[in-house]
Amino acid sequence: MMTLKVAIGPQNAFVLRQGIRREYVLVIVALCGIADGALIAAGVGGFAALIHAHPNMTLVARFGGAAFLIGYALLAARNAWRPSGLVPSESGPAALIGVVQMCLVVTFLNPHVYLDTVVLIGALANEESDLRWFFGAGAWAASVVWFAVLGFSAGRLQPFFATPAAWRILDALVAVTMIGVAVVVLVTSPSVPTANVALII
């Protein structure tokens, strides 16, 4: 399950950025951990089976996720092309409410996250229904560890991001990566284990 979290996505890119800036890292890590816990619980509890039983919902998640990723890529590309207040020492800390709102956006308004965190983890957990909640707990623990490591270790990179040019490079890389992930989402049919997947609350 750690491979799902390590994959580059809008949420990880956002946590990385906040970690480098050393702004509200604990709040963001905690928020991402709680959100993932809720999504994993939904999948393990049976929501994954509900989505899997309705192919149209999966289709919406695929194309909606790709659209979200492309939109995020365009925002990153804009920041890379026309940087504004990228260096923490120059721009000052962002408002907490704005940071929290952005964290919620990249977490819950990205349809692709529901394919990974809800559908895939939920389906895998229900392969062994008696142990599904232990599986979910393990997946959640891995998620929390990943966000903590990413957020708190990213601060060590701050010296490398002391100039706007470094942030422009990061945003450019994020933009290219998001486009690549969007293409993969569009051309790859989601493969979800189906055996023993049932609505078990």
UniProtKB/Swiss-Prot annotation:
It is found in: Cell membrane. One of its GO terms (molecular function) is amino acid transmembrane transporter activity. InterPro entries: LeuE-type, Lys/arg_exporter. It is a multi-pass membrane protein. GO terms for cellular component: plasma membrane. One of its GO terms (biological process) is amino acid transport. The keyword Nuclease does not apply. Its main location: membrane. It holds the Pfam family LysE. Keywords: Amino-acid transport, Cell membrane, Membrane, Transmembrane, Transmembrane helix, Transport. The chain crosses the membrane at residues 25-45, 57-77, 104-124, 133-153, 169-189. The keyword Chaperone does not apply. Belongs to the LysE/ArgO transporter (TC 2.A.75) family. NCBIfam families: 2a75. PANTHER family: ARGININE EXPORTER PROTEIN ARGO, ARGININE EXPORTER PROTEIN ARGO-RELATED. This is Putative amino-acid transporter Rv0488.
